[in-house]
């Protein structure tokens, strides 16, 4: 049975940066956001269904899902959001499981933004790692990275599980409010811990 760490955190918390560091140290990283982008990218496996369920306007000229339009469509409409999740989540789960099963590293870091919101997550992950930082820093990072307006970023944060609930579910917390070097040092310590746990 492969040792899998579930890595989660709010938008802009630094999940990808932490996951990249785990990968650099030799862990296998399976990132659900990356899988979702593949599924909804040009010619992706979900595109035909996106077109069927939501119409041609949600697929751009390159043949990819128009993420900005989809975000606007589902944010105010619970039924459409549920329809999109019912399409993508099983595909993401199946591809994640396939990649985890054939992962070459000593353990797997499974990056799942909505991990704590997922039913049964406790049974799937021997360890849950939450990447955490203050909300103001989340907003600043996302503005810099994506150029979204602050109101839209706060709307996304409000739609996610509360920070306190996420932290309560954590076995390990990576405080990503400091420097890159400080984050890397924490990842190195956690990597040593996970190597030991994976060897048991």
Located regions from the model:
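Well-ordered beta-strand positions
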Residues: 28, 127, 171-172
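ATP-dependent small-molecule kinase phosphotransfer cores
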Residues: 34-107
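Short, acidic/turn-prone active-site loops that include or flank metal/cofactor-
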Residues: 34-37, 133-136, 155-158, 180
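An amphipathic alpha-helix signature
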Residues: 47-51, 135-143, 150, 154
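Residue-level signal for inorganic ion chemistry
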Residues: 14, 33, 84, 109, ...
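Glycine-rich phosphate-binding loop of ATP-dependent small-molecule kinases
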Residues: 1-65, 185, 192-200
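ATP-dependent NMP and nucleoside kinases share a basic, alpha-helical "lid"
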Residues: 94-102, 107-144
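Small-molecule kinase domains that catalyze NTP-dependent phosphoryl transfer to phosphate-bearing small molecules
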Residues: 92-95, 104, 122-123, 144, ...
């Amino acid at each position: 049975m492969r040792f899998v760490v579930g890595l989660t955190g709010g938008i802009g918390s630094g999940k990808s940066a932490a996951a990249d560091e785990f990968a650099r140290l030799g862990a296998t990283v399976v990132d659900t956001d990356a899988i979702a982008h593949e599924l909804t990218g040009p010619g992706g496996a979900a595109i035909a269904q996106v077109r069927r369920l939501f119409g041609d306007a949600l697929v751009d000229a390159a043949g990819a899902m128009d993420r900005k339009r989809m975000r606007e469509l589902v944010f105010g409409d619970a039924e459409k959001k549920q329809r999109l999740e019912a399409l993508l989540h099983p595909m993401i789960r199946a591809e994640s499981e396939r990649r985890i099963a054939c992962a070459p590293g000593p353990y797997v870091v499974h990056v799942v933004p909505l991990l704590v919101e997922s039913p049964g997550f406790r049974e799937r992950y021997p360890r849950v790692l939450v990447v955490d930082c203050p909300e103001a820093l989340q907003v600043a990072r996302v503005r810099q990275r994506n150029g979204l307006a602050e109101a839209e970023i706060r709307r996304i944060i409000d739609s996610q599980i509360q920070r306190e609930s996420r932290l309560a579910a954590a076995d390990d917390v990576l405080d990503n409010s400091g420097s890159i070097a400080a984050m890397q040092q924490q990842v190195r310590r956690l990597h040593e811990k996970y190597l030991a746990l994976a060897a048991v």
